[in-house]
Amino acid sequence: DLAGVVDSIGEGVTRFQPGARVISTFFPEWIDGKPQADARNLPYRTSGGYFQGMLAEYVIVKEDALAASPETLDDAEASTLPCAGLTAWFALVERGQLRAGQSVLVQGTGGVAIFALQIAKAHGAEVIVTSGSDEKLALAKKLGASQGINRLKGDWAEEALALTQDRGIDHIIETVGGENLKHSLRAVAVHGRISVIGVLAGSDISLSAGR
């Protein structure tokens, strides 16, 4: 992710002038609406993947690959928005239609997870965080988490069900992937939503067709 200042512009550039504070976009070719693609060619041409990354003092990018940086944020804060911030927002608000009073379970304490925690709290949701660290769970509670579950000390899905009186979780931010998705399926409420964002434990899964 990038946050910086426009140094110079090329011919035909109209959206930015030298001196403008900008941040990068994660999908430079995806401006609005549904991404254009087909079953053989998925629309995942990202910065730092298909396009060059941003770990440099100077980079050359198309103007559509940039957005204006929020005036209320410094560069360090603004740089977290294009990937982590918008991923959490899109999952919970754009797609999830998050409402006050719903329950949100956030897995881990990484960038997407912490944004999801704060976005959910701002919308009036009850937030549960899972982590393998009691220290990180304590910090998550300071940021607004209602409950913390140490996933290394028991069955986190069962604990989540107990905390919701067996109703289950309305929104689960799934950042682990692999076999962990089985536990998310156990913990999610009827008509609930699982947003699969990370696959730290692997991309391969096997699930019961009866769940």
Protein language model regions, located:
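Short glycine-/small-residue-rich Rossmann-like dinucleotide-binding loops
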Residues: 10, 27, 153, 176-177, ...
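Short glycine-centered segments of the SAM/dcSAM-binding site in methyltransferase folds
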Residues: 21, 103, 126, 192-194
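NAD(P)H dinucleotide-binding glycine-rich loop of Rossmann-like/cofactor-binding domains
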Residues: 28-107, 142
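Hydrophobic/small residue at the entry helix of a nucleotide-binding pocket
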Residues: 87, 112, 179
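Adenosine-nucleotide cofactor-binding segment
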Residues: 103-109, 121-183
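Glycine-rich phosphate-binding loop and adjacent beta-alpha segment
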Residues: 123, 131, 176-211
